[in-house]
Amino acid sequence: MIGKQTKGTSFGGCVRYVLKEEKSKLLEAAGVEGTPEQIAEQFELQALLNDKVKNIVGHTSLNFSPEDSARLKSDDVLMLNIAHDYMKLMGIENTQYIIARHIDREHPHCHIVFNRVDNDGKTISDKNDFRKNEKVCKMLTAKYRLHFANGKDHIKEERLRPYDKAKYEIYKALKDELPKAHSWDDLKDALADRDIDMKFKAVSYTHLTLPTNSR
């Protein structure tokens, strides 16, 4: 399981996306109700309790490995329990939120949208969120005996832009060749066979580039 976090200044677009009818199932709502538009408005009204908070929108998607698909496919209770544990460990409490699962992809995932201005007008801290998110996801993956979802291993290559596709090709090549290489020269030769040129820019690190005629 991995968690992807974003923040924003307005709830409208985020709530509409998360609750898009054809691909979404609302599992739980706290402090908000009604249509996506009404829910967004209720989020915005509470945010007025603290005008010092600019990024009022908290949004996390919890993404599970395809290997957990069969287990989570029809178990909304399990997914909701995982989301509850995630929120508690991240300090997302005493605030409005919605939890919805999406059914548009091969891997199970759910979205948590919450108000960073809590019910008392206090700010829900985002200090050290990145590290805390990683730690919490690892803890819950172990607790619920889930698989670690590697986002890069399930990328849809055909959807990538040329620059991102080039970076992804480098990632795949390194993943394949690094375990087999016994020296930098071995790695350089192996990458050259894939039309990837490796150049040393400093003693401590390398820079990898794809030639302009690379596919």
Where are these regions (language model features)?
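N-terminal nicking endonuclease/strand-transfer module with a His-rich metal-binding environment
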Residues: M1-L208, S214-R215
